[in-house]
Amino acid sequence: MLLTFDIGNSDVTIGLWDHSTWRNVWRIPAKADQPELFYGIRIRDYFTETKLEVNVVESVVLSSVVPNMTEKIRNVIRSLFNMEPLLLGPSLFEKLPMKVLNPYEVGSDLVSNAMGAWQTYKRTCVVCDFGTALTFTTVSGNGEMLGVSIVPGLRTAIRALSQNTAKLFDVPLEIPKSALGTNTVTAIQSGLVLGYDGLVRNVVSSIRKELGEEIPAIATGGMSFVITSLKGFFFDINPNLTLEGLRLIGEYAAELKKKT
């Protein structure tokens, strides 16, 4: 089995690929102050709960956009699975069958999204990843990353309000019944949730206009189900798209290794 790790700013998402399907997907809050032991115990517990031995893991692929978490999780992988993970980075990006945009700067999560979308949908599309940041990654049907747009994610926007204003606070991310908020909670929900609905539609519309093509929009990420009004707007909602890209990159790297 193949194990994938996607280290983001909010969560460490772990996917176990059982040759033809995602057998399990787990999420652990990403906290840099937690020791390696914390993550090691959590991951081992996941395997115990699913009645699996850690030795079923044949290879591990790791993506990280949090530098101070990378080595910590690498050490956990070495300790638990007795192997070195394949770490996504510029040297690997340059060997991929797709054309990676600015390989020495682009985030490995964006590359994974592009790879997953290219191989899954076989056409030019834009991936809207709802995470700590909301990212829009456009990839062509020929496997070329065409460009990226980045804005703060929903939770990040709420946190910014609560941290930078005296009287506003965190609120649940729910669709408001009305655009006319009647208290602090519904006012923030109206502004953020309805506002982000418009933001997503406008960014995708601008990309389509620039390309001169009505390309499909694909949603992924932990917050992709929050703005339910966008459900019909997306061609597909694929919560495991980043992991799928990681898997494909891992399999491609393994084939390259066999040839050398």
Region roles according to the model:
Residues 52-106, 142-147, 153-154, 182-193, ...:
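Short beta-strand-loop/turn "lid" adjacent to the catalytic site in phosphate-handling enzymes
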Residues 103-110, 237-241:
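Active-site nucleophile and cofactor-binding loops and adjacent substrate-binding regions
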Residues 1-92:
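N-terminal glycine/serine-rich phosphate-binding loop of ATP-dependent small-molecule kinases
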Residues 1-25, 117, 121-145, 161, ...:
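Gly/Thr-rich phosphate-binding beta-strand-loop-beta motif of the actin/hexokinase/Hsp70
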Residues 210-260:
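Long hydrophobic alpha-helical segments typical of transmembrane helices together
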Residues 52-55, 120-122, 210-213:
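Glycine-rich phosphate-binding loop signature in dinucleotide/nucleotide-binding domains
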Residues 31-37, 106-108, 113-115, 119-122, ...:
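Glycine-rich phosphate-binding loop plus the immediately following alpha-helix
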Residues 196-210:
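A short, acidic, amphipathic alpha-helical segment used as a generic capping/interface helix at domain edges
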